[in-house]
């Protein structure tokens, strides 16, 4: 929250402010953005940026654990705090994608402007559908830089096996950076723990030792970056609805158009995967569906964004 202020103090005092360990634990990402990719125009950054939530989601995916059960195990192992809100509600990931977006755009990013949704509503049933679809669910922090707009958000996302971040499991982090010339590069490694973080801190100390007599303008300016409204961001959506599919087939098609429909044996519900649409269009269609389901004593059980 005070990154811009600290960078300005460092500039005024002609000293250096290093913060490699602020994102990704031991993964080098701040310095690559500043040095190795300095000739690139960064178009997109998407990552699994929180080891705690990734551990929880991995347990739910691979072992069928409940959210509460996986969270307790993470706490017992020291991966999650006694008060895990910053992790599971997505706030930690939000602050990290804000830092990466600021590095990419060279402008100040207020993390409070970034749409943020955590993993507390994800259930073991969601993962059963994901397994049937050949997908998984990950908590993403993402920013996309277009000609006149910057989109940034944090949310659980359903991804397929072909996605580069599909196999990033447990407390590991993975970050994709797409540039205008190089294309996509991936940064992967341990995103939590004292030794990975210590590795990044020591690297900063060594870096600083090479610049004792000069100021390195690492970071961003005080100019504020405007984040585009989430309503115009486009995704596919996974939706679970109570009750059998057949009586609702026409209703679902009226609201969402062509959809992929699926069911799980033994459950009195169905799920659908929409085509790509804006957040605003999805909310309007969802509201219409919920209104009509109310008369049938049925309800929407879950919604998750998808990159499929």
Where are these regions (language model features)?
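Short helix-capping/linker segments at secondary-structure and domain boundaries
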Residues: 63-66, 104-111, 209-213
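A conserved regulatory-domain signal marking ACT and ACT-like small-molecule sensing domains
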Residues: 205-308
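Conserved active-site and cofactor/substrate-binding residues in soluble primary-metabolism enzymes
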Residues: 24, 28, 40, 62-69, ...
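Catalytic, metal-anchored helix/loop core of enzyme active sites in primary metabolism
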Residues: 44-46, 54-57, 73, 79-83, ...
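Rossmann-fold NAD(P)-binding glycine/threonine-rich loop
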Residues: 1-35
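A generic structural signal for well-ordered alpha-helical segments
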Residues: 9-10, 74, 130, 251-256, ...
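Conserved anion/nucleotide-ligand pocket segment
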Residues: 34-95, 100
């Amino acid at each position: 929250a005070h990154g811009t202020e600290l960078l300005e103090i460092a500039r005024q005092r002609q000293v250096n402010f290093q913060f490699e360990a602020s994102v990704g634990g031991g993964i080098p990402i701040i310095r690559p953005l500043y040095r190795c990719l300095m000739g690139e125009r960064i178009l997109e950054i998407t990552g699994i940026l929180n080891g705690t939530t990734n551990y929880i989601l991995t347990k739910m995916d691979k072992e069928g654990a409940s959210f509460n059960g996986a969270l307790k195990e993470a706490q017992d192992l020291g991966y999650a705090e006694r008060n895990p809100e910053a992790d599971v509600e997505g706030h930690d990931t939000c602050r990290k994608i804000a830092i990466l977006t600021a590095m990419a755009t060279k402008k100040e990013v207020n993390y409070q402007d970034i749409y943020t949704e955590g993993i507390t509503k994800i259930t073991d049933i969601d993962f059963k559908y994901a397994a049937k679809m050949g997908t998984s669910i990950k908590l993403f922090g993402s920013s996309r830089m277009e000609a006149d707009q910057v989109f940034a958000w944090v949310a659980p996302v359903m991804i397929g096996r072909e996605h580069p971040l599909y196999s990033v499991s447990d407390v590991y982090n993975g970050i994709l950076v797409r540039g205008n010339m190089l294309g996509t590069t991936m940064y992967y490694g341990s995103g939590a723990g004292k030794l990975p973080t210590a590795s990044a801190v020591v690297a900063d100390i060594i870096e600083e030792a090479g610049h004792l007599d000069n100021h390195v303008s690492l970071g961003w300016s005080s100019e504020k970056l405007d984040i585009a409204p989430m309503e115009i961001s486009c995704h596919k959506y996974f939706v679970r609805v109570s009750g059998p599919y057949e009586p609702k087939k026409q209703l679902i098609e009226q609201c969402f158009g062509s959809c992929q429909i699926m069911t799980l044996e033994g459950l009195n519900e169905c799920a659908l995967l929409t085509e790509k649409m804006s957040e605003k269009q999805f909310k309007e269609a969802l509201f219409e569906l919920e209104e009509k389901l109310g008369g049938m004593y049925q309800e929407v059980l879950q919604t998750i964004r998808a990159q499929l």
